[in-house]
Amino acid sequence: MLVSGPSAIFEAVHRSLEGMAADLWYLGEREDLAAALKIFGNSMLFAMTGGIADILAMAKNLGVAPEDAISVFSRFNAAGALSARAQKIAHGDFSASFELTMARKDMRLMLDAAGDQPLVALPAIARRMDEAIANGHGKDDLGAIAAASLPEKR
C-alpha cells in the first residue's frame, strides 16, 4: 500500500494499515505522491498490456499462434531491463545501448509485420521516435524518446 501525507497522521494509523496490506510504503509528507505513484505503476501495466496486444496483432497477421508469440518471454526477460533502463532515462542518460535509428528500423519491421491489424501502442511510439530523431537524437539510445518528457536542464 502506498501512503503519503502528514507524518503525524501516518504514525497514528500505520499499525492499522499494516494489518490491511502485506507491504506498506510511506512516501513522505507530499499528500498527492501516493496517488501519483499508483497511476505511474498502472501506466506501466497499461503499456505492457498494449505491447502484448500489438505483439498478438503482429502474430495474427503473420499466422503465428498467440501462445507461440508470447513464448519469447520465457527466454527474453524484458522486465529485467526495466529498472536500469528507467534509471538511465530518468537521469537523462541517453548513451546508446540500442541506438534510436536502429530501433526505428525495427519499429518499421514491426509495423509492417502487423499489416492491417489494429495496433495499440506501436504507432504512437513510432511517432515519438521520429520526433526524437528529428530533434537530433538518432545516435542516442532508444530512451531518448523520453527526452521531451524530462525537465529542462539548467
Segments from the language model and where they lie:
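Acidic-glycine-rich active-site phosphate/pyrophosphate-binding loop
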Residues: 14-31, 78-87
